[in-house]
């Protein structure tokens, strides 16, 4: 996952009057360049830039926690409103911008601005549909558990301001927790909440308390005594509000959670179009996923055969093996890789060493420009656990010079030895290499660092998850095909297994929510079809219930990147080099691949 799920969740609040008089702090040099270059363009470009700047100025006030993550710190002391009035205000905000955009001559815009215009139009339509039709505010309690955790974590994780100032804003937000959680209880409709969402919320709700213990309380000594007393009082009030909310989650929400987590074809297809922003339909995605499923398994057998032959040199493999035989050989080769496990408490240290190894490899092979931005491997905060094993938390587009966090979830303490071993087999040292490539180098960390250098702040805010996740999967295959980790065939086999995971994600995503795939069928697809360990598959089953369409972004984005690379290689001919291609590809920010394709190949910008 590229961005922690809490970053942009929760309903939003109306714009305070004082904020209307101030402009958001843009990335100084790039923002100035972008504005001046637009003002030197056509009248349409000038009108568009005025609108885009105003949107970036006004939008953060609607979501104070999201604003902090973006790097706009005007609202660090405020906490989101989740009331019906706040939703109505947001709807008016969206419709106002839709009406203003209709008055701009899109055809008269520069190509770069045509892309940004399309992205904002898409985002506004998607947000309005989600609020008024999907209505997650009524049935998804995770929007709120992650909002409370993100409210404090986003203030404390990065040193964007003096600690005294950040602690003061933490106190401001903590004082508002009782109001927020009371609004949440009045907003959620238990009968509409799926049981799996309620169960996960019960586990996540208290996560913010660990943030107070680990990030806020140790810094109390930085404050004068009076401010210390205020912060302690705010923490006590927030903790009491969280405990009250925990009782409601356990005694009211959970017993009455009767919602259906399967969303059905209509909602799935609409959300798919918004989430992926790709020309591909659900049916086309399934067809390509099924084809890729068989192709990747076939390649896994070829690699596994070589590993098996090295282990058993006297064994003779059949020339035309059936699927059952292929399954046995692939599993036998995977067992060889599973012998190399990281220590239970050493996953973070393993990842730190692997980032250095991967960075040096990228430089040595001149694959892509390596930014000098700081990155730190951390234990995933408790409030964010339960959705994915790892994520890359890059600084917001308005925060410059801040660290990127590569967060890894620890092994749950309640797991028995069998469950721990299953997890470590899945995340063996070769899998950890692939995970680090995906999340950090040259995956999310590198790509998002490049993205942050693009001068359009609007494009930085409206990133495409499909482009981002697709690049990370592409990066996995790029590295192993270039010989990463000493050309070890075990690394190649594990990288193919991870690619197969992306494919099964896409197959399972729509099969569960549209076709009614059962847990047993999903586990069989993952464990037998995808060679995943039981713990990984069980966690993925939960994740597939908690979300829909997001699991399709990995494979769809990867295939779009592969298709684009082939097109550009043919168009550039002898001028093509991996370094030139990758640097150019990543120079446009993180828009959907179809827009990057148009920009790289000088094609019409999709509307």
Protein language model regions, located:
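Extreme N-terminal basic, low-complexity initiation segments
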Residues: 2-7
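Juxtamembrane/membrane-water interface recognition
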Residues: 9-12, 36, 297, 565
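N-terminal maturation segment of proteins
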Residues: 17-18, 40-607
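Bacterial N-terminal signal peptides that target proteins for export
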Residues: 20-28
């Amino acid at each position: 996952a590229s961005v922690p799920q809490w970053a942009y969740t929760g309903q939003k609040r109306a714009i305070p009057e004082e904020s209307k008089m101030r402009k958001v702090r843009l990335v100084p040099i790039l923002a100035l360049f972008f504005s001046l270059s637009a003002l030197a363009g056509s009248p349409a470009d000038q009108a568009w830039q005025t609108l885009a700047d105003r949107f970036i100025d006004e939008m953060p006030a609607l979501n104070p926690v999201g604003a902090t993550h973006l790097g706009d710190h005007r609202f660090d002391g405020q906490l989101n409103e989740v009331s019906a009035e706040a939703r109505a205000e947001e709807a008016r905000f969206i419709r106002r911008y839709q009406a203003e955009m209709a008055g701009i001559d899109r055809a008269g815009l520069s190509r770069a601005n045509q892309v940004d215009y399309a992205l904002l139009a898409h985002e506004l339509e998607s947000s309005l549909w989600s609020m008024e039709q999907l209505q997650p505010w009524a049935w998804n309690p995770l929007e709120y558990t992650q909002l409370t955790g993100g409210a404090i974590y986003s203030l404390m994780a990065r040193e964007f301001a003096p600690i005294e100032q950040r602690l003061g804003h933490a106190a401001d937000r903590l004082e508002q927790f009782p109001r927020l959680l009371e609004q949440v209880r009045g907003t959620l409709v238990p009968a509409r909440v799926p049981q799996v969402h309620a169960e996960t919320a019960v586990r996540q709700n208290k996560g913010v308390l660990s943030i107070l213990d680990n990030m806020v309380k140790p810094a109390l000594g930085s404050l004068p005594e009076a401010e210390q007393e205020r912060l302690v009082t705010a923490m006590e009030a927030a903790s009491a509000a969280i405990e009250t909310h925990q009782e409601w989650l356990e005694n009211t929400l959970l017993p009455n959670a009767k919602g259906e987590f399967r969303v059905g074809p209509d909602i799935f297809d609409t959300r798919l179009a918004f989430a992926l922003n790709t020309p591909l339909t659900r049916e086309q995605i399934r067809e390509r996923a099924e084809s890729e499923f068989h192709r990747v398994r076939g390649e896994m057998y070829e690699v596994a055969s070589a590993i098996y032959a090295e282990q058993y040199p006297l064994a003779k493999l059949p020339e035309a093996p059936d699927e059952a035989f292929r399954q046995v050989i692939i599993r036998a080769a995977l067992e060889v890789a599973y012998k190399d496990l990281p220590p239970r408490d050493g996953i973070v240290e393993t990842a730190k060493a692997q980032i250095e190894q991967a960075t040096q490899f990228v430089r040595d092979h001149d694959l892509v420009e390596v930014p000098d931005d700081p990155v730190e491997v951390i234990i995933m905060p408790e409030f964010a656990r339960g959705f994915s094993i790892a994520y890359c938390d890059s600084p917001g587009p308005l925060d410059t010079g801040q660290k990127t966090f590569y967060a890894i979830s620890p092994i749950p303490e309640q797991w028995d030895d069998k469950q721990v071993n299953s997890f470590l087999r899945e995340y063996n040292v070769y899998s950890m290499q692939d995970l680090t490539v995906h999340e950090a180098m040259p995956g999310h960390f590198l790509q998002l660092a490049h993205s942050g250098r693009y001068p359009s702040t609007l494009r930085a805010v409206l990133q495409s998850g499909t482009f981002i996740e697709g690049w990370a999967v592409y990066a996995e295959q790029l590295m192993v095909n270039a010989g990463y980790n000493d050309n070890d065939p075990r690394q190649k086999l594990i990288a193919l297994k991870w690619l197969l995971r992306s494919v099964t994600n896409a197959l399972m995503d729509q099969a569960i929510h549209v076709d009614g795939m059962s847990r047993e069928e999903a586990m069989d697809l993952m464990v037998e079809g995808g060679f995943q360990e039981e713990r990984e598959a069980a966690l993925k089953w939960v994740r597939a219930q908690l979300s829909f369409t997001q699991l399709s972004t990995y494979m769809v984005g990867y295939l779009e990147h592969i298709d684009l690379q082939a097109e550009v290689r043919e168009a550039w001919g002898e001028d093509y080099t991996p370094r030139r291609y990758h640097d150019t590809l990543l120079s446009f920010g993180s828009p959907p691949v179809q827009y990057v394709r148009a920009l790289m190949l000088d094609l019409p910008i999709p509307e």
